[in-house]
Structures are given as structure tokens and as C-alpha cells.
UniProtKB/Swiss-Prot annotation:
Keyword flag Transcription regulation: no
Catalytic activity: thiamine(out) + ATP + H2O = thiamine(in) + ADP + phosphate + H(+)
Enzyme class: translocase
Gene Ontology biological process terms in this record: thiamine transmembrane transport
Listed CDD domains: ABC_ThiQ_thiamine_transporter (cd03298)
Coiled coil: none
One Gene Ontology cellular component: ATP-binding cassette (ABC) transporter complex, substrate-binding subunit-containing
Entry protein name: Thiamine import ATP-binding protein ThiQ
InterPro entries: AAA+_ATPase, ABC_SmlMolc_Importer, ABC_transporter-like_ATP-bd, ABC_transporter-like_CS, P-loop_NTPase, Thiamine_ABC_ThiQ
Gene: thiQ
Top-level division of the source organism's lineage: Bacteria
Organism: Escherichia coli (strain K12)
Annotated binding of ATP, by residue: G32, P33, S34, G35, A36, G37, K38, S39
Cellular location(s): Cell inner membrane
Keyword ATP-binding: yes
């Protein structure tokens, strides 16, 4: 479904190079030390960075140089990027039409995803009137309403308390299963990864140093466990 072949990004003339295959509907965690290249990997997939070489295909179609707006990808960041002067409904609606001129079908999709996120009673509010968790639900709803086959998460819940973070991770996992979306999630927490991703990829020094079962990483028996400070 998603295939990266020697996708290379030059960071201060030092190459970060990634090869990775992710199947449709798979939920994969991307782990590794700070500065290892995790966010760079997601940005290359999303199209926010243009690779120096290599190829990226989605469903067999070459997207290596495709602009972000034409890629079948949605991405959620730690900063939710909500527009403070727009209501919750309008912020979600941007995922369907940048001009916010929604037809009846689009209106129905918007309200359905709001109910799924548990924010249907907040549609008339502004982002400044919401809690941090509620704002991230709105941002997630805006991603999901686009119905793109790939969802990228760059630590969007790291600022939330543990209980709320677990709640959001469960919500993401359930939503991806319902929509048959492929999920790649950057995280610093192997425990968070284990909640939703059976497979993990460990990035170190701009390379994929290891990939395999998340539980193996948690056990401390994987060759990359030490990179994450996990001992058996």
C-alpha cells in the first residue's frame, strides 16, 4: 500500500535514508531517540519535504514529487493548527471544503464525525473555549472527515495527561479500523505504541534501525530495545 524505497533527505548535507513498506489498514508506531529522523520520515510521506532521491508509492502510484494537497494522506501534529476565529464546525468543515461551502452530504459527514469524536455538542464554540483534549478531538475530526486512506500522527497527544492520552489513542485506533485507514504514529512512548500498534519501526541516525513486533521491543529482547532505554 505504502512503499518507500531509499527515500533520501539531506539534512545539513548528511543523508537521512528510509526504506519501508506498510500494508493497507496496518497501524505502525515510529519510535526512536530525539532528533533521530522520526518527524522527517512522516514529512517525507506527507510531501512537506522533497526527497533528494528515492521513490515513494501509494497503491502503486508514484507520489515521490507529488505536492501535499494531492497526496491521499492526512496528518495531525502536536500543535492542532485550529483557526481561533472559526467555530468547531467550521474548523472541521475545512477538511471537506476550504471555502466552507458544504453540501448536504458533506454536512452529514461533518456531523457524523463530530458525534464519533464526542464533540457534537461543541460545534458552535471557538477553539479558545475548549480544553486541550477537546481541541485535539476537533483536529482529529478534521483529519478523519477527509476520508484519506493514510493517517499520520506526529505526537499529537504528548501534552495530554496519561488517562486522556490513552483515551485519544483508543479513539484513533477504533476510527482507523472503522474507516480501514493505514496509521503511522510517531511517539516517544513504547507503552503508547503498544496500545494501538502491533508493529513498530525504530529510527536512529536517519535510518530505520529496526522493525518488528512492538511487544518484542517492550520485553527488552529486541536489538533496538536499548536505543529506547528498555532493558530485559
Amino acid at each position: 500500500m505504502l512503499k518507500l524505497t531509499d527515500i533520501t533527505w539531506l539534512y545539513h548535507h548528511l543523508p537521512m535514508r528510509f526504506s519501508l513498506t506498510v500494508e493497507r489498514g496496518e497501524q505502525v508506531a515510529i519510535l526512536g531517540p530525539s532528533g533521530a529522523g522520526k518527524s522527517t520520515l512522516l514529512n517525507l510521506i506527507a510531501g512537506f519535504l522533497t526527497p533528494a532521491s528515492g521513490s515513494l508509492t501509494i497503491d502503486g502510484v508514484d507520489h515521490t514529487t507529488m505536492p501535499p494537497s494531492r497526496r491521499p494522506v492526512s496528518m495531525l501534529f502536536q500543535e492542532n493548527n485550529l483557526f481561533s476565529h472559526l467555530t468547531v464546525a467550521q474548523n472541521i468543515g475545512l477538511g471537506l471544503n476550504p471555502g466552507l461551502k458544504l453540501n448536504a452530504v458533506q454536512q452529514g459527514k461533518m456531523h457524523a464525525i463530530a458525534r464519533q469524536m464526542g464533540i457534537d455538542n461543541l460545534m458552535a464554540r471557538l477553539p479558545g473555549e475548549l480544553s486541550g483534549g477537546q481541541r485535539q478531538r476537533v483536529a482529529l475530526a478534521r483529519c478523519l472527515v477527509r476520508e484519506q486512506p493514510i493517517l499520520l500522527l506526529d505526537e499529537p497527544f504528548s501534552a495530554l495527561d496519561p488517562a486522556l492520552r490513552q483515551e485519544m489513542l483508543t479513539l484513533v485506533s477504533t476510527s482507523c479500523q472503522q474507516q480501514k485507514m493505514t496509521l503511522l504514529m510517531v511517539s516517544h512512548s513504547v507503552e503508547d505504541a503498544a496500545r494501538i500498534a502491533t508493529r513498530s519501526v525504530v529510527v536512529a541516525d536517519g535510518r530505520i534501525a529496526w522493525q518488528g513486533m512492538t511487544n518484542e521491543l517492550l520485553s527488552g529482547k529486541a536489538s533496538a530495545s536499548a536505543l529506547l532505554g528498555i532493558t530485559g
